[in-house]
């Protein structure tokens, strides 16, 4: 499909136009019409009802929901994607509440500073949805996309969305969405592109502590960061003052290898090798909580069970329903930005780490391989990393 740049979509929204926002194939795999409440024109909701044909909802921030006492529609949300519906509403000035103009009045009242909870009748014909506070970086839904787009256009954190359906009542997908885009002259973006746009703008790590850390491999400074998005704790082990071009090891936490010295992998040996290198040459190790290439400790152990039954490290992840590698290097890039590191000599054998850092604006100027000895227990694992995952070992 043909997609537009986020900046072009933002300009269209500020002109009062609707845009199409498409989510992931593994999620709802649908396109929604999205407009920003503050900028939408008088025909927006009528267009959504006539051409979109889906349910018209009003994504809002948590603060707006609290302001108007908009409580969840149900006590126990069993929606497959956790869509956070509140009780439906009509503005007190509307008639039946269902006309396009009544729903427009209700939506606009949600961003009126003078509106009060008493101005809304419940239930009604407009369905507010509460967005997660960290937007698409926390949940990749149309709700969060609409509120994020509103904020990016400097508008009140509220929008209007509607699923796009075909004339026969089926959901529009793929080529059908592209035809809809061209028929109505609309911009179309993906939530994935919005996630990447937000990550580029995001500064989501905060330094919480810094201490001296003597180790078996030298004396380091240890920095403790926290992600404001996930509340995860990230440790950085550093030697010397940060440089514009820095020696960097991005190490994914491996409890079994780093702590218990498991011979199933080479993680612990790589960490020790990196510490020795950084102690001698300066630089930093960013220790990310990405156990099992992002699937978590228990799932990693389940993958080990499958490996004992004949799978390799890639097919085991796939059999559990995961991609072969779920890791993202957004947080690592944020930490490097914190230290004003613009390019790195990356201590790694993994090309995906080069790509992951480059995606977030960190240049990989050079690479230092980390070569560790194989053993009888990790030989097949190492071979799979080389052949199937492209590791340079």
From Swiss-Prot:
<feature type="binding site">
    <location>
        <begin position="249"/>
        <end position="253"/>
    </location>
    <ligand>
        <name>GTP</name>
    </ligand>
</feature>
<dbReference type="GO" id="GO:0008686">
    <property type="term" value="F:3,4-dihydroxy-2-butanone-4-phosphate synthase activity"/>
</dbReference>
<feature type="binding site">
    <location>
        <position position="267"/>
    </location>
    <ligand>
        <name>Zn(2+)</name>
    </ligand>
</feature>
<feature type="binding site">
    <location>
        <position position="28"/>
    </location>
    <ligand>
        <name>Mg(2+) 2</name>
    </ligand>
</feature>
<dbReference type="GO" id="GO:0003935">
    <property type="term" value="F:GTP cyclohydrolase II activity"/>
</dbReference>
<comment type="similarity">
    <text>In the C-terminal section; belongs to the GTP cyclohydrolase II family.</text>
</comment>
<feature type="binding site">
    <location>
        <begin position="27"/>
        <end position="28"/>
    </location>
    <ligand>
        <name>D-ribulose 5-phosphate</name>
    </ligand>
</feature>
<feature type="binding site">
    <location>
        <position position="142"/>
    </location>
    <ligand>
        <name>Mg(2+) 2</name>
    </ligand>
</feature>
<dbReference type="InterPro" id="IPR017945">
    <property type="entry name" value="DHBP_synth_RibB-like_a/b_dom"/>
</dbReference>
<dbReference type="GO" id="GO:0000287">
    <property type="term" value="F:magnesium ion binding"/>
</dbReference>
<dbReference type="Pfam" id="PF00926">
    <property type="entry name" value="DHBP_synthase"/>
</dbReference>
<feature type="region of interest" description="DHBP synthase">
    <location>
        <begin position="1"/>
        <end position="200"/>
    </location>
</feature>
<feature type="site" description="Essential for DHBP synthase activity">
    <location>
        <position position="163"/>
    </location>
</feature>
<feature type="binding site">
    <location>
        <begin position="139"/>
        <end position="143"/>
    </location>
    <ligand>
        <name>D-ribulose 5-phosphate</name>
    </ligand>
</feature>
<dbReference type="InterPro" id="IPR016299">
    <property type="entry name" value="Riboflavin_synth_RibBA"/>
</dbReference>
<feature type="binding site">
    <location>
        <position position="32"/>
    </location>
    <ligand>
        <name>D-ribulose 5-phosphate</name>
    </ligand>
</feature>
<keyword id="KW-0456">Lyase</keyword>
<feature type="binding site">
    <location>
        <position position="313"/>
    </location>
    <ligand>
        <name>GTP</name>
    </ligand>
</feature>
<dbReference type="GO" id="GO:0009231">
    <property type="term" value="P:riboflavin biosynthetic process"/>
</dbReference>
<keyword id="KW-0460">Magnesium</keyword>
<feature type="binding site">
    <location>
        <position position="28"/>
    </location>
    <ligand>
        <name>Mg(2+) 1</name>
    </ligand>
</feature>
<keyword id="KW-0342">GTP-binding</keyword>
<feature type="site" description="Essential for DHBP synthase activity">
    <location>
        <position position="125"/>
    </location>
</feature>
<protein>
    <recommendedName>
        <fullName>Riboflavin biosynthesis protein RibBA</fullName>
        <ecNumber>4.1.99.12</ecNumber>
        <ecNumber>3.5.4.25</ecNumber>
    </recommendedName>
</protein>
<dbReference type="Pfam" id="PF00925">
    <property type="entry name" value="GTP_cyclohydro2"/>
</dbReference>
<dbReference type="GO" id="GO:0008270">
    <property type="term" value="F:zinc ion binding"/>
</dbReference>
<comment type="pathway">
    <text>Cofactor biosynthesis; riboflavin biosynthesis; 5-amino-6-(D-ribitylamino)uracil from GTP: step 1/4.</text>
</comment>
<comment type="function">
    <text>Catalyzes the conversion of D-ribulose 5-phosphate to formate and 3,4-dihydroxy-2-butanone 4-phosphate.</text>
</comment>
<comment type="similarity">
    <text>In the N-terminal section; belongs to the DHBP synthase family.</text>
</comment>
<dbReference type="InterPro" id="IPR032677">
    <property type="entry name" value="GTP_cyclohydro_II"/>
</dbReference>
<feature type="binding site">
    <location>
        <position position="270"/>
    </location>
    <ligand>
        <name>GTP</name>
    </ligand>
</feature>
<keyword id="KW-0464">Manganese</keyword>
<keyword id="KW-0862">Zinc</keyword>
<keyword id="KW-0378">Hydrolase</keyword>
<dbReference type="GO" id="GO:0005829">
    <property type="term" value="C:cytosol"/>
</dbReference>
<feature type="active site" description="Nucleophile; for GTP cyclohydrolase activity">
    <location>
        <position position="327"/>
    </location>
</feature>
<keyword id="KW-0479">Metal-binding</keyword>
<comment type="pathway">
    <text>Cofactor biosynthesis; riboflavin biosynthesis; 2-hydroxy-3-oxobutyl phosphate from D-ribulose 5-phosphate: step 1/1.</text>
</comment>
<feature type="binding site">
    <location>
        <position position="353"/>
    </location>
    <ligand>
        <name>GTP</name>
    </ligand>
</feature>
<feature type="region of interest" description="GTP cyclohydrolase II">
    <location>
        <begin position="201"/>
        <end position="393"/>
    </location>
</feature>
<feature type="binding site">
    <location>
        <position position="254"/>
    </location>
    <ligand>
        <name>Zn(2+)</name>
    </ligand>
</feature>
<feature type="binding site">
    <location>
        <begin position="291"/>
        <end position="293"/>
    </location>
    <ligand>
        <name>GTP</name>
    </ligand>
</feature>
């Amino acid at each position: 499909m043909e997609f537009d740049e986020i900046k072009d979509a933002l300009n269209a929204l500020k002109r009062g136009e609707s845009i199409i926002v498409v989510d992931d194939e593994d999620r709802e795999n649908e396109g929604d019409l999205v407009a920003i409440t503050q900028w939408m024109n008088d025909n927006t909701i009528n267009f959504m009802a006539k051409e979109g044909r889906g349910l018209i909802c009003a994504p809002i921030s948590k603060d707006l929901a609290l302001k108007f006492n908009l409580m969840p529609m149900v006590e126990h949300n069993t929606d497959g994607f956790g869509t956070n519906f509140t009780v439906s509403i009509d503005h007190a000035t509307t008639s039946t509440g269902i006309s396009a103009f009544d729903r427009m009045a209700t939506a606009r009242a949600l961003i009126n500073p003078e509106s009060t909870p008493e101005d809304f009748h419940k239930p009604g014909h407009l369905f507010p949805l509460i967005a997660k506070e960290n937007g698409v970086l926390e949940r990749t839904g149309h709700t969060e996309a609409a509120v994020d787009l509103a904020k990016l256009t400097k508008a009140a954190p509220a929008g209007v969305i509607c699923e796009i359906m075909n004339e026969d009542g089926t959901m529009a997908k793929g080529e059908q969405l592209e035809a809809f885009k061209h028929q109505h002259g609309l911009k179309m973006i993906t939530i994935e592109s919005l996630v990447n746009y937000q990550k580029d703008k995001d500064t989501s790590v905060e330094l919480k502590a810094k201490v001296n850390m003597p180790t078996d491999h030298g004396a380091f400074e240890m920095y403790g960061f926290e992600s404001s998005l996930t509340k995860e704790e990230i440790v950085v082990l550093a030697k010397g003052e940060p440089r514009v071009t820095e020696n960097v090891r991005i190490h994914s936490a491996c409890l079994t290898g780093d702590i218990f010295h498991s011979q199933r992998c080479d993680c612990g040996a790589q960490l020790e090798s990196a510490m020795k290198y950084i102690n001698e040459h300066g630089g930093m190790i960013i220790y990310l909580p990405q156990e099992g290439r992002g699937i978590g400790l228990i799932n990693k152990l389940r993958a080990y069970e499958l490996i004992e039954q004949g799978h390799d490290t890639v097919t085991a992840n796939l059999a559990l329903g995961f991609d072969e590698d779920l890791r993202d290097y957004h947080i690592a890039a944020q930490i490097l930005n914190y230290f004003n590191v613009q390019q790195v000599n990356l201590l790694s054998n993994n090309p995906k780490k080069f790509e992951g850092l480059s995606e977030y604006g960190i240049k990989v100027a050079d690479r230092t391989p980390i070569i560790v000895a194989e053993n009888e227990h990790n030989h097949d694992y190492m071979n799979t990393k080389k052949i199937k995952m492209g590791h340079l070992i």
